[in-house]
Amino acid sequence: MKDKIVIKGAKVHNLKNVDLTVPRNEFVVFTGLSGSGKSSLAFDTLYAEGQRRYMESLSSYARQFLGQMDKPNVEYIEGLSPAISIDQKTTGRNPRSTVGTVTEIYDYLRLLYAKIGVPHCPNCGKEISQQTVDQIVDSVMKLEERTKIQVLAPVVRGRKGEHTKLIAHIKKSGFVRVRIDGEVYEIDEDEIKLDKNKKHHIEALVDRIVIKQGVEGRLTDSVETALKLAEGLVVINVMGKEDMLFSENFACPDCGISIGEISPSMFSFNAPFGKCDVCDGIGTLLEIDEDLVIPDKSKSIMEGAIAPWGEGRLKEESWTFGVLKALSKKYKLDINKPIEDYDEKTLNILLYGAPDVLKVNYVKDSQEMVFNHHYEGIINQMKRRYMESNSDYIKSEIENYMSNNPCPKCKGARLKKEVLAITVGNKNIFEFCSMPIREEVSFIDTLELSNKHKIISAQIVKEIKSRLEFLINVGLDYLNLAREARTLSGGESQRIRLATQIGSSLVGVLYILDEPSIGLHQRDNDRLIATMKNLKDIGNTLIVVEHDEDTIKAADFIVDIGPGAGEHGGEIIAAGSLEDIKNCKESITGQYLTGVKKIEVPKERREAGKNFIEIVGAKENNLKNVNVKFPVGLFTCVTGVSGSGKSTLVNEILYKALNKKINRSKLNPGKYKSINGIENIDKIIDINQSPIGRTPRSNPATYTGVFDIIRELYASTKEAKLRGYKAGRFSFNVKGGRCEACKGDGIVRIEMQFLSDVYVPCDVCKGKRYNRETLEIKYKDKNIDDLLNMTVEDALKFFENLPRIKNKLQTLADVGLGYVRLGQPSTQLSGGEAQRIKLAYELSKRSTGKTLYILDEPTTGLHTDDVKKLISILQRLTDMGNTVVVIEHNLDVIKCADYIVDLGPEGGEKGGTILCSGTPEQVAQNSSSYTGQYLKKML
C-alpha cells in the first residue's frame, strides 16, 4: 500500500461512508457538482487528517501554541503524507504583506542589495564611500561654538533581550553612563532592568564635550574609542537636539550625511532602521479627504454641503453659524452660494482656516457676546479631534471622511531615503519591485557586475531568478513584487502560494489545491497544468479540486463525486482514468466530457439599444485612458487575460463610481473623467462569493427573509395565540423561545487543555436550539426545528399552498439549491452556494427593471452543470429589464452573453486597452483578441 492512499469510511459533512483508493505520486483531480462533497473529502478529510497527524507528532508544549485540529469523521486513512493545502483564501488583510514578502523573493532581494548595493547620498545623489576619523571630527567641529555634545557608541541597535552581560561589559570597560532607548542611566547607581521581549537601543556614553578651539584632540580620542566599541559607528548627540550618526563605512563628503552599516534589515519596511518614519513602512497615510467632506459641490453650505456637519448643525443660534457669519463678513464667504463657485482662496479658508482672528457674535445665556476666535478650518479641526480624542466612536466617525493617500515623504516606497539611495544596476529596491515580474527577469539577466560582485551574488541571483520564473509559469508575469497581497484575487493569491511551494522544492508531500485555474485565462491554462505536473514529477502527490475541462483531461487519475449535491451527493460515482469517467453513464461530468450534455449557444441575442452606461477616461492602475460603453438591459461579459484591467474597470471604477453617486458611498472610485447614462439605473448590486453571514446563526432562511414569514406563520397558529407567543418567540437570536443553555446555538463548546475544543450537542435542547415550550407549537405536525432541518425541495411541497413562502423557496430551487437545508449554517456553505443564495434573493424581489448587477467570476466553484443553471439565472435577471455585467474567463458563460468588452492585449503594463467590444460573434472575428480566438471554437 506504499504507492496508494486508502480512505475507509469517510463521513465528513455529506459524505456517505466513502471508501476510496487514490494513487500516490500522481496528479489526481476530484470533480463533481458544486456541493457534492469534493472539498469535504479533499480538505476536511485528507488535509485535516494529514495536518492532525503531523501536529500529534509534536510535543504537548509545542501543540499549545499551534492550536489543535479536529479529527475528521473517518475510520482510517493509510499511506498519508504530510499535507499542504493551497486554497482560494486570499493572503490575509495585512497592508505590510506584498507579493515580494509572500513569495520570500524580497528576503533574497534585501540580501542582494546589502551585499552588492552601491550607496549614494540621499541629498545630492553622489556615490558615497567610507568616512575616516578626521572627516568625522571635522564635521562635528563645524557645529557652533559652545555647543554641548555627547559622544556615544551604539553597541545595540534594535535588538530584543535584557542585555545584562553587555551592560556589565560596558561597565568593565570603564564607562560610567549608558543611554538606553534615549534615556541616560548611571551604571553604578541606577537599577537597569530591560524587557526581554522589546527591542532596545543601547549606547555607551564615551564623553561629554563643549565645542571650542583646541578640543579636537580629545574629540578624536573619544570618536576613535566609540568607533572601536561600536564596530565602526559613532553617534554625536547635540544636547537638546537630534542625533548625528557617523560611520567609518559610508558618508557623503559634500553633505556630511552618513549611512550606517548596510545590512539586509535596512531594506525591510518592518524594521525600525529601514522603514519610513512618517507612514511607519506602510506607504500610505489615512488623511481627511476633501471630496468626502464635501461630496456634492453643487450644494451651498446652508443646503448641507459639509457632510460632517449634517443637517441640524446650522441653526441660526449655533456657534458654527456665528463663525460662518464672521467668515462671511471678513472674507466675503457666501454661505448660500454653491461650493463649486468658490474661488481657491475662499475654499482654502473654509477648509484649512483663516489667517486672522475673527470676531464672533454668539448668544450665551440669553446674552449676546463677542468672542475673539481663531478659525482653524473644517479639515484642520477634524484632524485635531482625531489626534486628541480617546473615543473610538469619534475616531470611527471621522474615519468616514478619511481615505488612504501615498505617504508624502517616501511617496509610497515604504523605506527611508537613505535606504532608497542604495542601488543595484542604477535601480533602488523599490524601483526594482515596481517593475512587472517579466521585466525583472530581463533586468537581472542584463546586470553588469564586477567579478567580485558576480561571485558574491551568484547564489542569491539564482534563487531570485528561479522564483520569478515560477511566478511567470503560473501566469503572474504581469504582477509586481511591490503589489499589496490583500489586493490580489483568490486565484492570484493561490497561484502565488503554488509558485512559493515549487520554489521550496519539497518532496514526498501531499499537495491539495482548490481550483487553481480560477481567474486564469484559457491562454495561460497550459502553463499552469505544466507547473502542477512539475510539482508531481519531483516526487509529490497532487490532489486538485477542479471543474476545468483541460485540467480534468490532463490528470492521471480522476475521482467523480456525486451524483447530485448536498444530501443527494457524497458518493463516489466513478474513479479512474479519463476513459473510465467518460464510460460511466451515471457521471454527469462524464456526460459533459463526451458531449452528451452541453451548454448550447443562444439561438438569438438581445440587441443593444440607444441607452448605455459610459465610462470616459478611465486610467486607474494599468487602464490607459479608456472609454467604454455597457449596453443597458443586456447581459455583458468583461473578458481579457489575467491582469488586463477587468477588475479595475468593473469593480474599482464602474461599481464604486455608481455606488458613490446612487448610494452616496464613502468609497472613492478609481481615476476616470466622467460617467454617463446614470439615469438608466436606480440600483446597483454587487453579488460576490463572500459568506452570507459570519456565524452559524445565519442561514439561507434568514438571509432570504423567508424565516420572518415562517415565524409569523407559527405565531398565528391557534396554540401560539392562546399562549400569547409573538413571532420573536421563534427566533434563536433573542431570549424567550430559544434554549438559554446554549443561547440558541444548539451546540456547546467544551474546552480541552491539549486537545482541540470539542463541540457537543446541547444536552438540554438536544441540538434543537429552542426550549421545550416553543417546540410544542406545531404547524401541520412540524415544529420550528423540524422545519429548519427540511431541504428546500421538501419545504416547497410543505408550503405549496402558501405563495409568499413558496415563491421565495422556488427561487432557491431554481438556482440549483434544492438540496440545501433551510437552517444550514452559513459557515457550511461554499462560496458558489453563497453567491447563488444572493442571486435567489435578488430574483425573489420585485424588479424595477433598472438594476445593475455586477458579478466577479461567478463560476468559481461551479461544475459545468451548475454553470448551466447560473447562465439561466443571469438570463432571467436580464429578461426582467435589468443590466448584468460579469467578469468571466469561462467560455460557456462568455458565448451566452449578449455583449462582450475584451481588454488586453496582455496583463499589467501591456494591458489596459479595449481590444474590441460587441457580440460574441464579432469578438470571435478579432485576430488580436485571445478571447476571440478561443471563442471561435465554441460558436
From Swiss-Prot:
This is UvrABC system protein A. Keywords: ATP-binding, Cytoplasm, DNA damage, DNA excision, DNA repair, DNA-binding, Excision nuclease, Metal-binding, Nucleotide-binding, Repeat, SOS response, Transport, Zinc, Zinc-finger. One of its GO terms (cellular component) is cytoplasm. The UvrABC repair system catalyzes the recognition and processing of DNA lesions. UvrA is an ATPase and a DNA-binding protein. A damage recognition complex composed of 2 UvrA and 2 UvrB subunits scans DNA for abnormalities. When the presence of a lesion has been verified by UvrB, the UvrA molecules dissociate. The keyword Metal-binding applies. One of its GO terms (biological process) is SOS response. Transmembrane segments: none annotated. Forms a heterotetramer with UvrB during the search for lesions. It comes from Clostridium acetobutylicum (strain ATCC 824 / DSM 792 / JCM 1419 / IAM 19013 / LMG 5710 / NBRC 13948 / NRRL B-527 / VKM B-1787 / 2291 / W). Residues 309-588, 608-936 form the ABC transporter domain. Its main location: cytoplasm. It is found in: Cytoplasm. Belongs to the ABC transporter superfamily. UvrA family. A zinc finger (C4-type) spans 252-279, 739-765. One of its GO terms (molecular function) is ATP binding. ATP binds at residues 32-39, 640-647. InterPro entries: AAA+_ATPase, ABC_transporter-like_ATP-bd, ABC_transporter-like_CS, ATP_grasp_subdomain_1, P-loop_NTPase, UvrA, UvrA_DNA-bd, UvrA_inter. Pfam families: UvrA_DNA-bind (PF17755), UvrA_inter (PF17760). The keyword Transport applies. The lineage of its organism: Bacteria, Bacillati, Bacillota, Clostridia, Eubacteriales.
